[in-house]
Amino acid sequence: MSHNHMMNNQQQHAAMINPGAVASVSGAQVQQRSMMSQQRGGSHAINSSKSPYQLQTSSISQFSHLQQQQQQQQQQQLVNNYHKQKQMSPDITSHQFSSSTGGGMPTQNGNYQSMSGSSIHTSMGLDNGQLSLQHQHHQYSSQPAQALQTSVQQHHYQSQQMTQQQQQAAQQQPQQQYQSFQQQHHLIQQQQQQQQIHTQQQQQLPQQAMHQQQQHLQLHQHLQQRSLNQQQQQQQRYQKQQQQPQPKQILQHSPTSGKSLSSAPHGTSVQPSTLLNHHQHNMAAPQVTPVTNGESAGEDTSPKDSPQAPKTSGRDSVHVSDNEESASNASEMQQSLANTKEKTPMCLINELARFNKMSHQYTLVDEQGPAHKKTFYVKLKLGDEEYSASGESIKKAQHAAAAIALVETKCPHPPPKPARLGCCDLEKSADGNITPTVELNALAMKRGEPALYKSIEPQQPPYYHQPNMDFRGLYNQRYHQYMRASRDPRYRGNGVLWPLRYHYPRMNRAFYVSLRVGHREFIGDGPTRQAARHNAAQKALRILKNLPVQSGEKKSEEQADEAAEDACEEDVDDSLKSEISLVHEIALRRNMVVQFEVIRETGPPHMKNFLTRCTVADMVTEGEGNSKKTSKKKAAELMLEELRKLPPLATPAFPRPKSKIQMNKKKNRNLIKSELQQQKADPNYGVGINPISRLIQIMQAQKKKEPVYTLVTERGLPRRREFIVQVEVEDKTCPGSGPNKKLAKRAAAEAMLQLLGYTKPSPQPTKSSFKNPSTGEAGQTNGDKKVTFVGGDSPGDGDDKVSSGSNQQRVPGLLHLPSKSSASSSGNQHTASKESLVNLASILKPNLRPEIQLRELCKAMDCQLEIDDFTKKRTSGTEHITRITIGSENPQSFHGSNTSLESSRDMAALDALKVLVARAKDIHPGGDGPQVKKDVLARSGSGMKKDFSK
């Protein structure tokens, strides 16, 4: 306390002399006080408030505190040394200066000494702290001036030594401070990095928790939805079984119903886990355990959950596979024909016909409608029963007929196939419907390696075996029992004792299959040959799934040789070979050369007919078909019959393969075209088809040349053309006309069909382009909109009109004039005679007014003319408006206006004459009559202009 009090007094006295020097001392003291307070009790409070998120800066503050404490100790040591020297030499006195000097005297270390008459204030400054000597003022004020002067000199010398020591320490201090600063900076960076990592972890924790929670929620919802879908599917299957009682009766009477679980619905797989854990089905709700990595979750549905569920035991319970999850809607599955899980009606009909040993055939009866939207009619003959249906395509019509036959047929349905229980069922893949062999074939195809199966016949054990040994080499199967002769029933006298033997059941036969995939070989065994194949395929899948797929690499020569050897070792029955292969084999045995050649190709590009010739030695056969493959096959069939007539060979080139059970050859899928050619020639077939297509079908059915269409001529204006097309079939020709080539071709085809005897008319297109004279432009009657104009100047005599034929229309651009020879040939109906044109030139005289010329022209052309005049009063005068209407069917109006009535009529008549002159210019030479001379029209037009200007 005394030391602190003394330091405070020194600071107050020094602040009066040099406030700037005291600032550094006060700052150091503040730090010293804070460090002292931390040492006493403040450190515990600081340490207690530390957290992993707060920087630990206590090391920095401690370092600065130690540095300041060392400086304070050095200063205190100097003061103590000064007191000791003073005690040892008490004669030392301080210097006394006169009061008249005033001001301050600078010392060596840069400080100033302030002097007065009564007291001397001395202040000394050091580099890192100021040491004040103010506390000596009261002690030295009473001493003599000489002693004071000597003491000041001695103290000045000591202060110089202290400054030298401090300068040396100051030179060493920056290096130490730089090293300590680097260490502190490194520690601070490490602490900041730790804090950032910790904050990032704290931020990621809630996100990961939320993501995991969402995944669990989605998985739970998915499992709930799947369990509901499976319950609905089970109810739907049970309802289907109730609707079809006949298969149930068959299942009840089948001998394998108890073993094969035939009560399971079609399309489901029986899992062995359901047989072992059948007591789990008595639970009230299904237990769902989520399984990751693509494995299917085990689900057990209880029959008690649904009120309509049948009461079945644990052995009859069915495990629904995961593949049926997508088929929640049964109706959509029946409609989609491409679904592989459900059999199509045609497939079921095939099974039904095979079960009842009867034949079935589809026949295309008729097709109607336009080419882009046809309707096909198909008839199914199933034994003695016939069913008909229609559809947008042939395939849809076939399926519709098959569906009707399945419902209405009286033939017994085949029983559903029982589920197989073998060793392969215990290790099924994730997809219950895909067998290991199918999965292996797909994998081998990706790798480009063939999967070849070969049966291995196990060696039969000998009929004898070693004594006291069974077939497995065990000794405890039989033993000798020696008993007395009186008690032993086997004792037969003469000391012979027969041994007792145990009779064991016969061991089940095991099947072995060798599977070779590329250069790898796998051996599979099982109770059946199919089970052995599945076992070998599973072993191959375990290894091949872990290997990388090598796509694009070619097989090595060794692998190719091995595959060729295996292919040669396989026995292939002749019934499974094609006729072409059999022809080549027989020719090879007899050292003959086989040659196939396409000699003729006829028909349009979309429906060609090929004729192929087969030559073997001196034998030649020909086959015809709609494709090269079909024609080649037919030629090979005929050649095969010829080759079988040859005498057998004495020594065959190679032994024939073992004969197997003859199997019925697979019928051609395209049964629908067996009688199509004869049906197309029927007049009742294809009534609604386009006449052009119908005519082509008839010619193809009769194997005649297709019709040839030729454009004869075209006439009329560019926008009102008329085309005439002629069709030629053998020696018959028929023309047809229409506003475009397509309709003219259709009309010609219809005329040819009528000529050939196909009298049923085909329906006209909905939007016909034919223009009937009694109708408007769009084929609609004018009705009430038709207006008849009666002209007083027109003669209106019907005998003088030029009438066209019943099927002809007036060609625009030609001026039809009344003529006495109107009943001439049809070729001259659309042309004007020379006399008529001369009269037309005499009518267009330049001396006549336009109104008179128009009246004369309309009278000559037998055209109705109507003139209407209107008067309108204006401020400038009276204005006359004239409207001239020409024609009755398609009237045309022309207007004119002027101050006088004659001028307005002439103006409207001039416009009407221009239209008629323009029509006359469109007449083309070349069979349509002479052309109006241009000079006559020019003179007529100039005369009308002059008259109008007058």
From Swiss-Prot:
Biased composition (Basic and acidic residues): 313-322, 922-937
Record-level Gene Ontology MF annotations: double-stranded RNA binding; mRNA binding
Compositional bias of kind Polar residues: 45-66, 78-122, 254-274, 765-782
GO CC field: cytoplasmic stress granule; dendrite cytoplasm; neuron projection; neuronal cell body; perikaryon; plasma membrane
Domain DRBM positions: 344-411, 435-546, 578-645, 690-758
Highest taxon of source: Eukaryota
Compartments it resides in: Perikaryon; Cell projection
Single biological process term from Gene Ontology: germ cell development
The keyword Oxidoreductase is assigned to this record: no
Main subcellular location of this protein, as a coarse class: other
Presence of keyword Repeat: yes
Biased composition (Low complexity): 31-43, 67-77, 130-143, 153-168, 202-253
Assigned keywords, A-Z: Cell projection, Repeat, RNA-binding
SUPFAM superfamilies attached to this UniProt entry: dsRNA-binding domain-like
Tissue: Strongly expressed in nervous tissue (at protein level).
Stretches for region Disordered: 25-168, 202-274, 288-342, 758-833, 922-950
Protein's job: RNA-binding protein which is required for syntaxin location in sensory neurons during long-term synaptic facilitation. Binds to syntaxin mRNA and is required to maintain its accumulation at the axon hillock following neuronal stimulation and at the opposite pole in stable unstimulated sensory neurons.
Name of this protein: Double-stranded RNA-binding protein Staufen homolog
Lineage: Eukaryota, Metazoa, Spiralia, Lophotrochozoa, Mollusca
